[in-house]
């Protein structure tokens, strides 16, 4: 993307945040990804079994053993992310009394994205992936952008409660939203002002867009 590996754009968006640790999960073609990241001050951790996004984050636990604070989780296939929006999200999270903040946005065509389920007051209850959603839930236009601010202590406790009881038989990272609510926490959300900036790239067609 713009003559650079896609993940470079994500890493560069994060760099000005001065994170204590930066960890990249690798799996498919891990050697190529690791080679592309040699110029950056970060560590790579392999997800040997492709068992879902929740499992991928769980694989990073050992790398964060000595860290205590806020974990920012992003997808490596969102090359249009801007530092300014990540800073805004971090500010929203730090000013809220919550262990978890998620980024949402609204799309006219939300196909393939997890839907944000809220109560009548607009409070976030859960994220339902498209393959697990009912027909009614699929009409929801507010989607999960796949970016999270999570307090580390809550994150790994919650991930141990995630199951593979879903249509894809995987550990969904999105399940930590419902787990937070179930444990009496309010989940904050940052509504991204530019939907196109958080869209992922899963094909050459999406890349061209």
Please report, for each region that a protein language model flagged, where it lies by residue.
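Rossmann-like NAD(P)H-binding beta-loop-alpha module
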Residues: 105-136
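Conserved N-terminal catalytic core of the sugar/cofactor nucleotidyltransferase
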Residues: 5-91
